[in-house]
Amino acid sequence: MNQAAVQLPLPGFEQASGQWRSDYSRQVAGEKPVRNRSGIEVQPLYSPRDWAGERYLDDLGFPGQYPFTRGIYPSMHRGRTWTQRQLIGLGTPQDYNVRVRRIIDAGATAISLLPCCSGFRGIDCDEVDPVLLGTCGTVVNTTDHMDAALDGVPLGTISTAMNDPSPFTLLAFTLGVARRRGIDWRSITGTSNQSDYISHFIANHQFYRLSLPGSRRVLLDHIEFCRRALPNWNPLSVVGQHMQQAGATPAETMGFTLSSAIQYAQDCIERGMDVDDVLRRFTFFFDISISFFEEIAKFRAGRRIWARIARERLGAKDPACWRFKFHGQTSGVDLTQQQPLNNIARVSVQAMAGILSGLQSMHTDAYDEAIACPSEETARIAVATQNILRDEAQLCAVIDPLGGSYYVERLTDQMEAEIEAVIARIDAAGGMYKAAEVGLVQTMIGESALAFQEQLETGERKIVGVNCYQVEEDPTIPPAERPDPEAMERHVERFKVFKRERSQDAVARALDALARAANSERENVFEKVVEAAEAGVTHGEMVGCLRRELGFGHPLIIA
């Protein structure tokens, strides 16, 4: 079957093309090459010579059809728009509850919970000066805390995302709340969207709690438990965001992320899990930078590559496993403290790139996130940005509206080649686990970060208000929203009372069972985490126990 859409030469094509190039060269004599963040040279004009559609069905196809370049579902956003999943976290569980209810009222169709930095560090609130608590996330250390945070939130109806690194205590607390409310665990939907320990080891050391092999063990146990008890929960979200925000180019980010997905899939297969059963619940989480067309091409290429990896390399038979389901967050790295209102425009461009690339859910950053955690007002503006793009700009009217653009299709092909080269390099190093363990990935990211910084310092790459178009500004930084210190002190005191009054015998038995599970290949560590949460064991106690048994998480530092 001849799939060609355009046959060259067109009548007069060469003459017209040559005339344009001559005219263009006279007007821009001495022009320097323009390159995107992945280093691909961007031409001034694209034509049928760059992409003529010869392999339309093989490389693009139709939405919902392999290789899913144009979208993973037939109707895409025309039939069902993306999920609006705003990241929320500040203060006490009661503070979170007030804000999450208002965000739902403002149009959010799913929720996320960001824990306090003390929680990310693996410790409880009574181990930290209260003035430091709740400034960058919500303090949730027990099932009671989670119950307060989710008061009135319809678990089993609304999708939840837990920013919850290993050993996934937030999910354990959530399951305890569901049991209290008589909610069937099988109805709970959402994602463990910080389960990608390799990305933490490489690029987000705050989230890194357990040793590399310990993290591997707990993740596999977590996936097995969720397959059995939580059929609608996504136990793994492979995170490219950390690596791109650390300095990886968009092409490198996609290559690293897909390499991690290959590693996790192979680990599950070696554990004896069915590949189709596992991949059906795989999801991805990415940064969306302001490099508009590059981001769109990154995601279109990523969909195509993942479909081929899942089907041909990993052997998945179910077409649902070939779908590249991803959440996008507009990039905070692109936001500036200078002239912060300009960030509203930046976030709008980033969000448009995400929508036009066909994401499944999105968080739009608030314009003040370069300064502090967003205020309630700026968070509402961020949600409204999505509503405006969807309902006023009608960006959902056409599926893959940039598909067929000579530029976008050529750039998608070029990004695909760059991404596949990264995957090949990781494969040659023995896979993503080995490549991270020896520092290859960290070195590559460092080199890209340095190159980007040099471009900023020379002015080759411009940021309005930072290295160009600077204006006199009030040097006073707007006050950051902070938790009520008295409320936080009361929260800590109640926590101390809880620890004194709970059953100490039950806690001791649960921690002993958790330690024994960590040292037994026959027991599931995450199952014991869930049981410990219901017995009143705190977040810090569970993390501390597993650190003793499986090793403390020390990331590799590359000089």
Swiss-Prot record:
Question: Would I find Protease among this entry's keywords?
Answer: no
Q: What class of enzyme is it?
A: isomerase
Outline the protein's biotechnological or industrial applications. Answer: This enzyme and the derivative PCM-F, a variant in which the alpha and beta subunits are fused into a single polypeptide via a short 11-amino acid linker, have potential applications in bioremediation of pivalic acid found in sludge, in stereospecific synthesis of C5 carboxylic acids and alcohols, and in the production of potential commodity and specialty chemicals.
Q: Does the keyword Cytoplasm apply?
A: no
Q: Which reactions fall under this protein's catalytic activity?
A: 3-methylbutanoyl-CoA = 2,2-dimethylpropanoyl-CoA
Give the superkingdom in one word.
Answer: Bacteria
Please cite one Gene Ontology biological process associated with this protein. Answer: acyl-CoA metabolic process
InterPro entries named in the record: Cbl-dep_enz_cat, MeMalonylCoA_mutase_a/b_cat, MMCoA_mutase_a_cat
Molecular function (Gene Ontology), one example: cobalamin binding
Q: What is its EC number?
A: 5.4.99.-
What this protein is called in its record is Pivalyl-CoA mutase large subunit
Q: Which organism is it from?
A: Xanthobacter autotrophicus (strain ATCC BAA-1158 / Py2)
